[in-house]
Amino acid sequence: MKLITEKYPQIKKLFGYDPNFKWVVTGMVLVQIISLPFVTQLSWPMMLVVAYCFGGVINHSLMLAIHEIAHNLAFGHNRPLANKLFGFFANLPIGLPYQGNEVIDTDLPTLLEAKLFCTTGGKLLWLFLQPFFYSFRPLVVRPKPPTPMELINLVIQLFFDAVVIKLWGWKAIGYLLIGALMAMGVHPVAGHFVAEHYMFKKGYETYSYYGPLNWITFNVGYHNEHHDFPAVPGSKLPEVRRIAPEFYDTLPHHDSWSKVLYDFVMDPDIGPYARIKRKHHGLDS
């Protein structure tokens, strides 16, 4: 980061929040809520198709929005409470509390996962179960008591879920929850989970993705750029690459998240173990 900003100090002008971000997120939340009475008119099989192709994509994008909000990129770093409360609002259609914080190493598969899911069939099953591993792995790897704000988030979320069930029934809440879970598993937008850190080329531990799905995922594919400049909102990450191409264009990257998932399952040299774990000073290793 220092080397890049020394050569291109204009990148610092990209720091801060995107004033349009909160309106995009608000629109996504409203679309999900407005769709609920229509979803209840669908058969269960058709509802699942719509949840996979539409609702789940929006919910996954909202998860990525919450990650942006965790960086205080909705209202700026000087308004942390506003960011936190807006994160609660963005969370509503997901159905379950999602913090969006980067908890060190809890997204790394455990040794048991690496041993159990190392075959082609095992890796495919691991992708299907990925929502559950992401949800419960932190409770095993680095358990911690919930904070007051996390408890408030839980109460707000459960109240919203109860209102949805009261107004539109169990199919409506199922649409939100199932869509969110499906879009975290074997789904093109979930390819970023694997694409970002799994070592597809020896010696490179992080990878960006420069395909069209960035348009609906707040440019989460610009992963190297985000790691270098977490204070730059997703909408401006392509500008980082444009300003400093020699720092990014020479790195291996992905052009298709679907291909990432296919290669992950079919390539015997790639699996849940194909990640680099760094030691963090001051933390138990």
What positions do the PLM features span?
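Non-catalytic, topology-defining segments of multipass membrane proteins
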Residues: 1-56, 65, 88, 93-175, ...
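Aspartate-rich (DDxxD/NDxxD/DxxxD) Mg2+/diphosphate-binding motifs
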Residues: 64, 68-85
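Transmembrane alpha-helical segments that form the membrane-embedded catalytic/substrate-channel core
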Residues: 54-66, 127, 131-136, 177-203, ...
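Histidine-centered catalytic micro-motifs
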Residues: 62-71, 97-106, 193-199, 216-232, ...
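Short, function-defining helix-loop hinge/capping sites that tune catalysis or transport
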Residues: 37, 75-79, 205, 227, ...
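Membrane-cytosol interface motif
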Residues: 204-218
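Residue-level signal for cytosolic alpha-helical hairpin/rod architecture
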Residues: 86-87, 222
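Short acidic-hydrophobic sequence patches enriched in Asp/Glu that either
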Residues: 80-85, 99, 182, 236
